[in-house]
Amino acid sequence: MGVFTYETEFTSVIPPPRLFKAFILDADNLIPKIAPQAVKCAEIIEGDGGVGTIKKITFGEGSQFGSVTHKIDGIDKENFVYSYSLIEGDALSDKIEKISYETKLVSSSDGGSIIKSTSNYHTKGDVEIKEEHVKAGKEKASHLFKLVEGYLLANPNEYC
């Protein structure tokens, strides 16, 4: 098994505490509300929403995938760090065993956030992951993030 790591970083004008509440802690409610074409629904299969919880994410009509299953690996509300693993679903091919993600929000000098994301692709055998596939997924995630950011800017009293 190989592990391929990809890191991305982008910025937001929203401070980490507010962004973490919306984009991480309440994503299962907020994203289907503001982007139903991307995520139809999220449901907890097992657990209480904390570490070890298993969730099924069902994608919207326009998605190339039907659904995926996530396992929450870590939530650090004080340091704004969230990690989970994609363990089942049609986003995993016969070449990938699982994908682990970590998102960390840190304060930027302008009062906003720097979002640091690390993805670890655990492959079966000696398979290599093509960077263009990863970039396509990152672009979709970035688009969702921008929708959340836009929602927070338009609704300044939410997630305070």
UniProtKB/Swiss-Prot annotation:
Gene3D superfamilies: 3.30.530.20. GO terms for cellular component: cytoplasm; nucleus. Keywords: Allergen, Flavonoid biosynthesis, Pathogenesis-related protein, Plant defense. GO terms for biological process: abscisic acid-activated signaling pathway; defense response; flavonoid biosynthetic process. It comes from the Eukaryota. Involved in the control of flavonoid biosynthesis in fruits, probably by binding directly to natural flavonoids. Binds the natural flavonoid myricetin with affinities in the low micromolar range. This is Major strawberry allergen Fra a 1-2. It comes from Fragaria ananassa (Strawberry).
